[in-house]
């Protein structure tokens, strides 16, 4: 059973989502929280598998909460709850180690599937939101007088197969899914991911996925 903490400053959202998810026998909502700091404190105490985290909250927002959790509790995954207006904050949360994000108005089935994906080691990156984030990154560059996002030299150090694996990381796939798609073993995927993280000098697979999206390896 997957243990979950739900974090949102709005009572109706927090309790409503908790009630919906508690109906699923594979999920156990062990606590709720009103802000990022409270989520962190409860995560330390209760050791959940996943924290569902709203982005915009008073006292301590979702980015701050994500940073606290991922830096101190590496076994706990964070999945962001957001709206289309929060793409800048989503990017910050991903850079702090969140395993993906969902729109708040998505169906319970979609949220459950996302939780299962994150729990199995994958990421959740809805294409429509990811494309919007990418467009904002491009727009930021254009405002600075740069027409295209230049690809870093580190990408040249990757093998063709590592580039393929990196692209799939950007689409949110876990090792098993990548192995099936590329017709290689999970162990081989794991080795490729380790090499990618080392060569790109990123912290983890989440950072590698962001890198892949930002520099156009994963195309949306």
Curated annotation (Swiss-Prot):
The Swiss-Prot or TrEMBL record marks DNA binding at: 175-194
The entry's cellular-component GO terms read: cytoplasm
Superkingdom of origin: Bacteria
Which InterPro entries does UniProt cross-reference here?
CheY-like_superfamily (IPR011006), Sig_transdc_resp-reg_C-effctor (IPR016032), Sig_transdc_resp-reg_receiver (IPR001789), Tscrpt_reg_LuxR_C (IPR000792), WalR-like (IPR039420)
Residues with the 4-aspartylphosphate modification: 54
**Residues of the HTH luxR-type domain:** 151-216
Organism name: Bacillus subtilis (strain 168)
Q: Which UniProt keywords apply?
A: Activator, Cytoplasm, DNA-binding, Phosphoprotein, Transcription, Transcription regulation, Two-component regulatory system
- The segment(s) forming the Response regulatory domain are 3-119
Task: Give compartment(s).
Answer: Cytoplasm
Question: What's this chain's function?
Answer: Required for resistance to linearmycins, a family of antibiotic-specialized metabolites produced by some streptomycetes. Member of the two-component regulatory system LnrJ/LnrK, which induces expression of the LnrLMN ABC transporter in response to linearmycins and other polyenes. Probably binds to the promoter region of the lnrLMN operon and directly regulates its expression. May also promote biofilm formation.
The molecule here is called Transcriptional regulatory protein LnrK
Gene3D superfamilies assigned to the protein according to its UniProt record, in alphabetical order: 3.40.50.2300
Record PANTHER family: TRANSCRIPTIONAL REGULATORY PROTEIN LNRK, TWO-COMPONENT RESPONSE REGULATOR
Signal peptide residues are none
**GO BP: any one term:** regulation of DNA-templated transcription
**PTM per Swiss-Prot/TrEMBL:** Phosphorylated by LnrJ.
Coiled-coil regions listed in the entry: none
Per UniProt, what is one GO molecular function of this protein? DNA binding
Q: What happens when the gene is disrupted?
A: Deletion mutant does not show any observable phenotype.
